[in-house]
């Protein structure tokens, strides 16, 4: 089995003016595709090539391969981006259980956003920022490069089931925002798919 590029559930310009069409197209068809190509190449003729990406990521610490670090980066890139595309949608509203849980953990929605933005802005270099469910407690964490919380603490230095995630690699925003990372981070709130996030809270 080879991993394939998932189709986006919207057009490349659907998130304008916050996430621009050119960035979305390059991000999806070039960067994400490259992670998939590399993952398939690394796993070719191994017993791991038939595993769903979620299972592969969850046992990464147990895998013995010469190119394990490259697998970590590229398989992580695949699962992170697959999650990211589903996490974006214009016009959704934060309501119900997720809103209650965020307020319980962080005080207010504005305080939650401020903390998320601070973690994203102060993360050095490339990586991701996540809202995760850690055994029933919502936490904001960051991971380096293409690490995922699903890889577990031994690899990603954190853990939890992702509820929302933001790509803070420069390729995710530089065409539109250049070095204005905070503007990109703040624009994210306009395209968070809160419906998907609420569904993830229930898992």
Swiss-Prot record:
One of its GO terms (cellular component) is cytoplasm. Keywords: Manganese, Metal-binding, Oxidoreductase. Homodimer. Its EC number is 1.15.1.1. Binds 1 Mn(2+) ion per subunit. It catalyses: 2 superoxide + 2 H(+) = H2O2 + O2. The keyword Acyltransferase does not apply. Its cofactor is Mn(2+). Mn(2+) binds at residues 27, 81, 167, 171. Destroys superoxide anion radicals which are normally produced within the cells and which are toxic to biological systems. This is Superoxide dismutase [Mn]. The gene is sodA. The keyword Hydrolase does not apply. GO terms for molecular function: metal ion binding; superoxide dismutase activity. It holds the Pfam family Sod_Fe_N. InterPro entries: Mn/Fe_SOD, Mn/Fe_SOD_BS, Mn/Fe_SOD_C, Mn/Fe_SOD_N, Mn/Fe_SOD_N_sf, SOD_C_sf. Belongs to the iron/manganese superoxide dismutase family.
């Amino acid at each position: 089995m080879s991993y394939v590029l998932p189709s986006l559930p919207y057009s490349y310009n659907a998130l304008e003016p916050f996430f621009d069409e050119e960035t979305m197209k390059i991000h999806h068809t070039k960067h994400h595709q490259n992670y998939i190509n590399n993952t398939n190449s690394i796993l070719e003729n191994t017993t791991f090539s038939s595993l769903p990406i979620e299972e592969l990521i969850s046992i990464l610490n147990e895998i013995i391969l010469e190119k394990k670090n490259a697998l970590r980066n590229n398989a992580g890139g695949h699962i992170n981006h697959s999650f990211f595309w589903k996490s974006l949608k214009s016009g959704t509203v934060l309501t119900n259980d997720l809103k209650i849980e965020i307020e319980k953990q962080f005080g207010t929605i504005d305080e939650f956003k401020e903390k998320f933005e601070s973690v994203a802005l102060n993360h050095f270099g490339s990586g991701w920022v996540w809202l995760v469910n850690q055994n029933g407690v919502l936490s904001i964490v960051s991971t380096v490069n293409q690490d995922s919380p699903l890889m577990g603490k031994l690899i990603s230095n954190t853990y939890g089931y992702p509820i929302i995630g933001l790509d803070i690699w420069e390729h995710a925003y530089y065409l539109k925002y250049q070095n204005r990372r905070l503007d990109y981070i703040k624009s994210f709130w306009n395209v968070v798919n809160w419906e998907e996030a609420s569904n993830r809270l229930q898992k």
